[in-house]
């Protein structure tokens, strides 16, 4: 019942099922071992949890226009898609591990009122020992897109004849080295996917003063990304933090 994919060498890479939970080593996904093909994470029966030892980065972090062009990435949907089934729970062991949806990639995490999708820490989901207000138990989420940012230079008017003067590839907060990712562009209509009935809790990390991982960081995320019924609970720094873009929210609770 565990998630699997076929890597570039033709090998089938799959999580290990222990009878209840699915466990994924860094050989499945981690910083420097990004997911570069479509991946579906199923719901597990009997309270099963998807436990990741490494970070889950979807798509590649292209730092400049030449890299984006070589990869054929110009908008959301050009890269791999992460699909998470309703009722699934995903967990990570510490706050050096987190989730990135890179520009061009998309996440479709669509839960229901009775079966939400949960992103949390193993201390919460597996050990059951997380305090209600504990933070920094795992990193959190970063979702990037090609939306407009005031950190880039444009001509014209937003929503009319806007055009970039130069490249727009902004390093996202909360990461360095292999953990780095980038956001920004001139496409406020970009789509990074859909989050609905999603819970994110016990997150956060500080890389430097004023440079943190939040519950979810949205970098240049466009308005065609659908976000509805989102709950972010017990997070270090901010529940959500917006860096440019034009995404809208319907029903958000931050506790």
Please tell me what each predicted stretch does:
Residues 1-255:
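Beta-strand/loop edge motif enriched in small/polar residues
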């Amino acid at each position: 019942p565990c998630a699997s994919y076929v890597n570039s060498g033709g090998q089938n890479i799959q999580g290990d099922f222990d009878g209840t939970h699915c466990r994924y080593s860094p050989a499945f996904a981690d910083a420097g071992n990004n997911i570069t093909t479509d991946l579906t994470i199923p719901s597990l029966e009997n309270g099963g949890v998807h436990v990741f030892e490494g970070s889950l980065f979807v798509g590649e972090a292209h730092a400049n226009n030449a890299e984006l062009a070589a990869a054929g990435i110009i908008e959301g949907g050009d890269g791999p898609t992460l699909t998470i089934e309703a009722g699934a729970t995903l967990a990570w062991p510490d706050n050096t591990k987190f989730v990135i949806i890179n520009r061009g990639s998309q996440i479709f995490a669509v839960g229901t009122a009775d079966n939400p999708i949960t992103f949390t820490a193993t201390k919460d989901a597996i050990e059951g020992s997380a305090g209600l207000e504990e933070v920094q138990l795992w990193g959190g989420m970063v979702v990037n897109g090609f939306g407009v940012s005031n950190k880039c230079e444009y001509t014209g008017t937003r929503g009319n004849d806007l055009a970039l003067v130069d490249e727009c590839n902004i390093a996202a907060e909360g990461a360095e080295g292999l953990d780095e990712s980038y956001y920004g562009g001139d496409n406020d209509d970009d789509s990074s996917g859909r989050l609905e009935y999603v819970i994110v809790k016990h997150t956060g990390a500080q890389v430097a003063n004023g440079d943190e991982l939040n519950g979810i960081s949205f970098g240049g995320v466009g308005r065609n990304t659908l976000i509805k019924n989102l709950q972010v609970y017990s997070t270090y720094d901010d529940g959500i933090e917006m860096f440019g873009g034009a995404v809208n929210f319907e029903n958000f609770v931050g506790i």
